[in-house]
């Protein structure tokens, strides 16, 4: 089995990228054969997440999907999760919450920490909870695409994740924004209505705005903060 500690000694898999799903289904089939229940999908329920959930359901209908429930998400995001649960009732969707409630965080670090120190807020409400989830598994799945931002252009299908000492599987690396939406429309998948309101990338409500640059899908995240990632993905 390919693990973080055996990264240098185990042969890495290769996948075709010229088929209908640009390798995504092949990658997922390999991942669930390789890891079984030792792999989870950390999903934000953005549009890439919806595509991945549909693909995963074809490979492992009872897969474990983890949502980092920071307590700061848009209501539209929670509505999307409810629709996904109705569409894929066999999936095991886990709402992973941080140790601190928003009130406890405010008491300890001050009100609206996301405005003063967004990195600390992301660490408390996303990074630490994900680390706890990944402690019990060998690998995780992510919806990263190379087209999403300059910081993601070199992502591979299978990656050594030094931050979480895990294997990170990214089936959608070759998908374009157009590919994603074509798949959603073709299969009539439920999705977050905020995408129709100018939000190509959706995170916590206080730190997400409509895209500022049409050529940078993540330009609406942490606008004015000099920040482009929540800390889950090394750049």
From Swiss-Prot:
Cofactor binding notes: Binds 1 [4Fe-4S] cluster per subunit.
Cell compartment(s), UniProt: Cytoplasm
Record: residues binding [4Fe-4S] cluster: 121-122, 204, 207
Reactions listed under catalytic activity: [thioredoxin]-disulfide + sulfite + AMP + 2 H(+) = adenosine 5'-phosphosulfate + [thioredoxin]-dithiol
Active site feature: 230 (nucleophile)
Keyword list, A-Z: Cytoplasm, Iron, Iron-sulfur, Metal-binding, Oxidoreductase
Cofactor: [4Fe-4S] cluster
Gene Ontology terms: cellular component: cytoplasm
This protein's pathway: Sulfur metabolism; hydrogen sulfide biosynthesis; sulfite from sulfate
Organism name: Geobacillus thermodenitrificans (strain NG80-2)
Stated family: Belongs to the PAPS reductase family. CysH subfamily.
Record-listed E.C. numbers: 1.8.4.10
High-level lineage: Bacteria, Bacillati, Bacillota, Bacilli, Bacillales
GO biological process entries: cysteine biosynthetic process; hydrogen sulfide biosynthetic process; sulfate assimilation, phosphoadenylyl sulfate reduction by phosphoadenylyl-sulfate reductase (thioredoxin)
Stated name of the protein: Adenosine 5'-phosphosulfate reductase
Gene that produces this protein: cysH
Function: Catalyzes the formation of sulfite from adenosine 5'-phosphosulfate (APS) using thioredoxin as an electron donor.
Keyword Chloroplast: no
SUPFAM superfamilies for this protein: Adenine nucleotide alpha hydrolases-like
Entry GO MF terms: 4 iron, 4 sulfur cluster binding; adenylyl-sulfate reductase (thioredoxin) activity; metal ion binding; phosphoadenylyl-sulfate reductase (thioredoxin) activity
UniProt enzyme class: oxidoreductase
Pfam families: PAPS_reduct
């Amino acid at each position: 089995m390919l693990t973080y500690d055996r990264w240098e000694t185990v042969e890495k898999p290769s996948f075709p990228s010229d088929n209908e799903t640009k390798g995504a289904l092949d990658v997922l089939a390999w991942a669930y054969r390789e890891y079984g229940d030792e792999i989870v999908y950390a999903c934000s329920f953005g549009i890439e997440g919806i595509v991945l959930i549909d693909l995963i359901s074809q490979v492992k209908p009872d897969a474990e999907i983890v949502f980092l429930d920071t307590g700061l998400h848009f209501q539209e995001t929670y509505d999307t999760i409810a629709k996904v649960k109705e569409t894929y009732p066999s999936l095991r969707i886990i709402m992973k919450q941080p140790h601190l409630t928003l009130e406890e965080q405010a008491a300890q670090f001050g009100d609206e920490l996301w405005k003063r120190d967004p990195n600390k807020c992301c660490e408390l409400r996303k990074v630490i909870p994900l680390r706890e989830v990944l402690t019990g598994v060998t690998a995780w799945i992510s919806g990263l695409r190379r087209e999403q931002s300059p910081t993601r252009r070199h992502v591979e299908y299978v990656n050594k994740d030094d931050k979480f000492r895990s294997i990170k599987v990214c089936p959608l690396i070759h998908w374009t924004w157009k590919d994603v939406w074509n798949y959603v429309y073709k299969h009539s998948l439920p999705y977050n209505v905020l995408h129709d309101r100018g939000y190509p990338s959706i995170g916590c409500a206080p730190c997400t705005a409509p895209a500022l640059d049409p050529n940078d899908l993540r330009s609406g995240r942490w606008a004015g903060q000099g920040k482009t990632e929540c800390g889950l993905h090394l750049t």
